[in-house]
Amino acid sequence: MKEKFNEKVIPVILKFINTKAIQSIKNGMVTSMSPLIIGSIFLILSNFPVKAVVDVLESTGIKPVLDQVCGATFSISALIAVIGISYSYAKLENQEPLNCGIISLATFLILMPSSITTEGGEVVSGIINKTWTAGQGMIGAIIVGLIVPPIYCWFLKKNIRIKMPAGVPEGVTNAFSALIPAFVILTGAAVILLDSTQQVLKLFTKLFRHHFRK
């Protein structure tokens, strides 16, 4: 039984683990470890289990600084993930990875709800909501990070790009090469947003939660 399992199941699992999508998620999520670990340290210090220490931190004005560092690191976890996953995917495809990460970040921000309703019922628009740049937006970040890079890489592989003459710096060449795929991807995100009234990331999250509740 064990031999049959090793012969039939293990190769399938290994094949799945070694797919570009899974490798990209793994490598991309690892990039968020450093800021999250640092943020966790500041979180522990800010909520130290000794009241006397907390009182000193509050009286000296250090606690708000600790909270700021903690909030800043945890509040961008989804942004780090979408950049890291996209970067890793493009790198596996041997394409320029940084532009891919930036395009994915822009796509994520386009699809993210950009308005909130205050307790008084006032709608505030044109914001970057930290709720969705943190853990709640992680599912959306993973999905965007797996959809954008294949499209980006397809354009570059098909040589559908703006070509620059020889002698132009590599950074400039890469930037212009990414213009066409960036235009198509960001325009597509805008069309999706127009048709969904800013509920795209919420839909991703709800579908994921509904699936795993079954």
Give the label of every model feature segment.
Residues 1-37, 42-44, 54-58, 62-214:
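Signature of multi-pass transmembrane helix bundles
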